[in-house]
Swiss-Prot record:
One of its GO terms (cellular component) is RNA polymerase I transcription regulator complex. Component of the core factor (CF) complex. Interacts with acr1. A zinc finger (RRN7-type) spans 4-37. The gene is rrn7. One of its GO terms (molecular function) is RNA polymerase I core promoter sequence-specific DNA binding. It comes from the Eukaryota. Keywords: DNA-binding, Metal-binding, Nucleus, Transcription, Transcription regulation, Zinc, Zinc-finger. It comes from Schizosaccharomyces pombe (strain 972 / ATCC 24843). It is found in: Nucleus, Nucleolus. InterPro entries: Rrn7_cyclin_C (IPR048538), Rrn7_cyclin_N (IPR048540), TAF1B/Rrn7 (IPR033599), TF_Rrn7_Zf (IPR021752). Belongs to the RRN7/TAF1B family. Residues 142-171 are annotated as: Disordered. Although it shares weak sequence similarity with sua7/TFIIB, displays a similar subdomain organization as sua7/TFIIB, with a N-terminal zinc finger, a connecting region (composed of B-reader and B-linker regions), followed by 2 cyclin folds. The keyword Metal-binding applies. This is RNA polymerase I-specific transcription initiation factor rrn7.
């Protein structure tokens, strides 16, 4: 080091206010080690003078490998652009997973790109309008980088129209900042526009199984981009838990409301026939109820259309946006309710009910063992469900050897970095191997893995649930004279021991939806069915 410390103007590096410098090998450095480029700070020869002067030097090309530039956090407009670039990288990864792993149509990538372009144009418009409003009010301080702008639209409670007018600026700000949750909304809306049978529940399952990158998607962002993001933006890209059905639905409805109100985008309803067929298979119902469920669904839609056309303002934009909101929010729940009501019509949840009207002229009727259906469906879904996400220190003590091996495999896949094997020391891996290679121990371990043979065995048991049995001639005559009256599944004071109530609870639990919403949908479908029967009479 040449000479002593001397004082000068503040350092030219951003966020460094050091005024003390030293020289080393002819180069001037500040107290924090930042090299001063382009300006030479000279000290007076007379000691104690306390004066300094600046001399211009030939402009030197700045070294791009300087750590100060690479690690510098970007704020303002550049920070927004960098965050949107990081979000776009995650969208590209999810599109690749849809086309390569799941075999989706290649058009979905272009559809998501178009929706993202519309969203970007809308965010730019909202930012410019808010920027102009800030410039008009000179007394208002700039708050573009505050937490106020990072408000999630779905976390806001329902407000009155008057309060919405006062918070118009904050809503326009929130449009410019899509959280990671809205990536699933882009996928779902793109599938709606392409008429692909993707449900919110299936999207949630694909995210939980890491088939669609979500929980660790931020690790795929280049480091030179990620470390320059503001901390508030980083929080929006790192999720703390997997998204639930309700949160994905809220993000979808928010995105649809924005696109419909701004661009008058026509969002079609879900592809109900294909989704209905998939739901019947997933809950192991007989395929014979597909046609009754489809007819019942058409009856429900006709009742909704009759109720909608009675209003004079039905063709207005507000009414159309509300109708799209209602269709998307209740579509899957309405399909589940239609399947359950169709099963009640065809087979009945109570032994006193009419079994199946198509067996009136036959010597057979269908005897349904709903207790077996409940036990087998619950068993199959428990085997297919990954239970490690909610595991804690108490439940880990109940795992056997095979479950413990699967837990370590899951942990290694989810949390151990492939490019950094030093996360787990090599010595510990030798003492406690993740994959046990002891064949004699594995032979004695119970196999809880769901194989194809076990699935076939469970399906064979499910075939015994809906079994045609013979009836006597006298019972046949009484059965044919019986009046076709529909018995409601769930009365207003439901009994928890009732078979219909137990089946409804099971379906709501497996589909991860609220029980109250499913019960309300079932009662609405039943009212439409009774209205249709009354109109035919």
């Amino acid at each position: 080091m040449e000479g002593n410390w001397f004082e000068g103007p503040p350092c030219s590096v951003r966020n460094c206010k050091s005024t003390w410098y030293f020289k080393n090998a002819g180069q001037t450095f500040c107290r924090r080690g930042h090299a001063q480029h382009g300006i030479e700070i000279a000290q007076d020869d007379e000691p104690g003078a306390g004066t300094f002067y600046q001399t211009r030097k030939r402009k030197v090309v700045r070294n791009h490998l300087d750590t100060g530039d690479e690690d510098e956090i970007v704020y303002g407009t550049a920070g927004r652009s960098l965050y949107l670039q990081a979000f776009q990288i995650i969208l590209q990864l999810q599109c690749q997973a849809l086309t390569t792993k799941l075999g989706f149509d290649q058009r979905i990538e272009g559809m998501i790109r178009d929706l993202w372009a519309l969203y970007l144009s809308l965010s730019y418009e909202s930012f410019t309008s808010s920027f102009l409003s800030l410039n008009q009010n000179s007394t208002q301080s700039e708050s573009s980088d505050s937490d106020f702008d990072l408000i999630d639209p779905e976390s806001q409670p329902g407000a009155d129209p008057s309060s919405r007018k006062t918070k118009e600026t904050s809503q326009s700000h929130s449009i410019s900042y899509p959280r990671l949750l809205y990536s699933s909304a882009f996928i779902y809306v793109a599938c709606l526009l392409l008429r692909l049978p993707l449900t919110i529940h299936k999207l949630e399952v694909l995210i939980r199984k890491n088939i669609i990158p979500y929980y660790r998607a931020y690790k795929q962002i280049p480091l030179k981009i990620f470390k320059r993001l503001q901390k508030n933006y980083v929080r929006m890209l790192i999720p703390f838990h997997y998204p639930t059905y309700q949160r994905i639905q809220s993000a979808v409805l928010t995105l649809v409301d924005v696109l419909v109100s701004k661009y008058e985008l026509k969002v079609p309803p879900p592809n109900e026939p294909l989704i209905l067929f998939e739901l019947i298979n997933s809950f192991f119902f007989p395929l014979e109820i597909f046609i009754p469920a489809s007819r019942l669904l058409n009856l429900v839609h006709s009742q909704i259309s009759l109720q909608g056309t009675s209003s004079d303002n039905y063709q207005s934009k507000i009414r159309s946006a509300q109708s799209i909101h209602e269709k998307l929010s209740d579509a899957e729940v309405m399909l589940l309710a239609t399947i359950l009501v169709a099963a009640n019509v065809c087979y009945g949840f109570d032994d006193a009910q009419t079994r199946n009207s198509k067996y009136k002229d036959s010597m057979f009727t269908v005897k349904t063992n709903w207790n077996m259906w409940l036990s087998q469906v619950q068993k199959i879904n428990e085997k297919e469900k990954d239970k490690f996400y909610e595991i804690d220190e108490q439940s880990i003590l109940t795992l056997n050897n095979s479950e413990m091996d699967k837990y370590f495999q899951w942990y290694e896949k989810e949390f151990v970095e492939e490019n950094n094997p030093n996360n787990i020391p090599e010595g510990i891996l030798n003492v406690f191997p993740i994959l046990s290679k002891d064949s004699h121990l594995q032979e004695n371990q119970p196999t809880d893995i769901l194989t194809d043979e076990s699935v076939i065995a469970e399906d064979v048991k499910l075939e015994q649930v809906f079994k045609p049995v013979g009836i006597k001639e006298s019972d046949k005559m009484d059965f044919s004279r019986r009046k076709d009256a529909y018995i409601s599944m769930l009365p207003f004071s439901p009994n928890t021991e009732n078979t219909a109530h137990r089946v409804t609870i099971m379906v709501a639990k497996l589909y991860n939806i609220k029980l109250d919403s499913l019960i309300a949908a079932i009662r609405y479908v039943e009212s439409c069915l009774k209205t249709g029967i009354h109109n035919q009479d």
